[in-house]
Design a protein with these regions (language model features):
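Active-site loop immediately N-terminal to the catalytic Tyr-X3-Lys motif
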Residues: 39-45, 67-68, 114, 132
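Alpha-helical segment proximal to the catalytic Tyr-Lys
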Residues: 18-19, 63-64, 135
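Residue(s) in the substrate-gating loop at a strand-loop-helix junction
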Residues: 34
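Active-site helix of classical SDR
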Residues: 13, 50, 58
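Catalytic Tyr-X3-Lys loop
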Residues: 1-11, 30, 54
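Active-site loop-to-helix junction immediately N-terminal to the catalytic Tyr of the SDR YXXXK motif
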Residues: 40-48, 60, 88
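C-terminal substrate-recognition "lid" of short-chain dehydrogenase/reductases
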Residues: 113-144
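Short, small/polar-rich loop/turn modules that mediate ligand/substrate recognition or access, typified
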Residues: 66, 71, 137-139
Length: 149
């Protein structure tokens, strides 16, 4: 759990910096995390801990690189229409006997918009943070969750 969700981000950031970003003194590092890194969720403690760790890494590294033109941010999607969400819905159905509609309703209940996040909404947030107009945004954990957080 920690290797996939925390160590991999650390190593990726480390490699990006070593591959020339640090020498150039400019660039964008963006981690895709989860709202679990902002608030946590029951029954996924290790996952939430790893995601909290990525946000801590993001904030600390942003401070270390603040005097360069390298920004470090995290995007924290809520429940997003992906295969991972499909597995979560199936898991709820299997463990609780709820219908698909009930399982989906349970997951969207925390989203004030009452829906799942679309993958392209997450991608657009990442693209903005990688773009030329985001130079003063660093050390942030941007929630893309329909107002959940």
């Amino acid at each position: 759990m920690m290797d996939v969700n925390l160590t991999s981000v650390f190593l990726t950031f480390q490699q990006a910096l070593a591959a020339g970003m640090l020498k150039r003194g400019e660039g964008r590092l963006v981690a895709v995390v989860s709202t679990a890194g902002l608030k946590g969720y029951a029954y996924v403690s290790a996952y939430a801990a790893a995601k909290h760790g990525v946000i801590g890494l993001t904030r600390s590294l942003a401070l270390e690189l603040a005097e360069t033109a390298i920004t470090v941010n995290a995007v924290c999607p809520g429940f997003t229409l992906t295969p991972m969400l499909e597995r979560s819905i199936e898991n709820i159905m299997n463990k609780t006997g709820k219908s698909r509609q009930e399982a989906e309703a349970a997951l969207t209940a925390g989203n004030p918009q009452g829906r799942f996040v679309l993958p392209e909404e997450v991608a657009q947030a990442v693209m903005y943070l990688c773009g030329p107009h985001s130079g003063s945004i660093t050390g942030q954990a941007l929630s893309v969750s329909g107002g959940e957080i």
